[in-house]
Amino acid sequence: MAKAYVVAVYSKIIDPEKLKNYLQDSRCVMGAHGAKALAIGSNISNISKLEGIPPERAVIMEFEDVEAAQKAFQSNQANEEKLEGGVDRVMFVVEGV
């Protein structure tokens, strides 16, 4: 089975305190589902001037497979609701090759 990668791109952090609390609570849930953080941070640069404005924060996590990633985020639903309105974010899962 192919690994899965969850990518979260935070275009805007509206409420840093909500994000801080979300991250503290979510780390335990994600870890319990085998998540491995590959990249977390806000030190983001464009590759070229044509790429637009870089996000304020980005996260990449590795899971054993897509199903494990989906289960982790289903288990984390209560934390997701606490983050509501705290960030503008796009999050998706990509199956590895």
List the predicted regions and their residue ranges.
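Short S/T/G/P-rich N-terminal loop/turn motif that feeds into the first structured element of a domain
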Residues: 1-70, 95-97
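C-terminal end-helix/capping segment
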Residues: 84-97
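C-terminal structural segments of small proteins and small subunits
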Residues: 69-87
